[in-house]
Amino acid sequence: MKVTIAHNNYDKTLKTVAYLKEILKKKNVVFDAKYPDVVISVGGDGTLINAFHRYENQVDSVRFIGVHTGHLGFYTDWRNYDIDKMVDALLLTDEAPAKYPLLEIKLITESGETKYHLAVNESAVKRVSHTLEADVYINDELFENFRGDGLCVSTPTGSTAYSKSLGGAVIHPRLKALQMTEIASINNRVFRTLSAPIVIAPDQWITIVPNADHFVMTVDGARIDVRNAKKIEYRISHHSIQFDQFGHHHFWSRVQDAFIGENNSND
């Protein structure tokens, strides 16, 4: 087994990483940052998502483990005080990994060039200082003419992130569905949109055709300035992000822990 560690640079994280490296070396674990079997992310969700994008070209052969050292971690199963237990489980457990759907993004330019991206959580299309005007298609059939600040397309696990703050539903990852949420849509006698999140089946796709030469597309929060784009296609990828399943909390436990916490009722 070949392992690498991805981490942020906070003091608490660096102390955890130093201890983790010490334990792994004692267990004679091989470190390989180029072609790892397992990526251990120490920090928070942002650290893990950055680690995914670093190894997304190896997504079918890499598994992820998240160690949480901050205040909130949706993708992190272990705490910094669980390092010994986590390493023992890593070396002794041979369970099939838990798999979560990924978002495939296909950006097609006016010249016919195609650029591909993968997202763990979501991708959004926006304009910086102007209203976004875009035609939205589902399975190549026109669905609506959108006017507003932007549009967000998310995975099921991404439904707990930016999409949720936009009023989207929280979707279990086994559904493998896409969700599109509107960002401050304009609705009046001239412009009409659905003004509600939509959820589509895993064998369907969403196409956004912006009526602008220049706009911003985000992929898991990373900004991409886009010029001369013809359209953007979104669908559930045939790839998945894989998490080692030992100690893996089920989806609704993660949601409850992240957004509700302990029951503080005085009853």
From Swiss-Prot:
It comes from the Bacteria. Its EC number is 2.7.1.23. One of its GO terms (biological process) is NAD metabolic process. NAD(+) binds at D45, G46, N121, E122, R147, D149, T160, A161, Y162, S163, K164, S165, A184. Belongs to the NAD kinase family. HAMAP family: NAD_kinase. GO terms for cellular component: cytoplasm. This is NAD kinase. It comes from Lactobacillus acidophilus (strain ATCC 700396 / NCK56 / N2 / NCFM). GO terms for molecular function: ATP binding; metal ion binding; NAD binding; NAD+ kinase activity. Gene3D superfamilies: Probable inorganic polyphosphate/atp-NAD kinase, domain 1 (3.40.50.10330), Probable inorganic polyphosphate/atp-NAD kinase, domain 2 (2.60.200.30). It catalyses: NAD(+) + ATP = ADP + NADP(+) + H(+). Involved in the regulation of the intracellular balance of NAD and NADP, and is a key enzyme in the biosynthesis of NADP. Catalyzes specifically the phosphorylation on 2'-hydroxyl of the adenosine moiety of NAD to yield NADP. The keyword Nucleotide-binding applies. It is found in: Cytoplasm. The gene is nadK. Its cofactor is a divalent metal cation. Keywords: ATP-binding, Cytoplasm, Kinase, NAD, NADP, Nucleotide-binding, Transferase. InterPro entries: ATP-NAD_kinase_N, ATP-NAD_kinase_PpnK-typ_C, NAD/diacylglycerol_kinase_sf, NADK. PANTHER family: NAD KINASE. The active site is at D45.
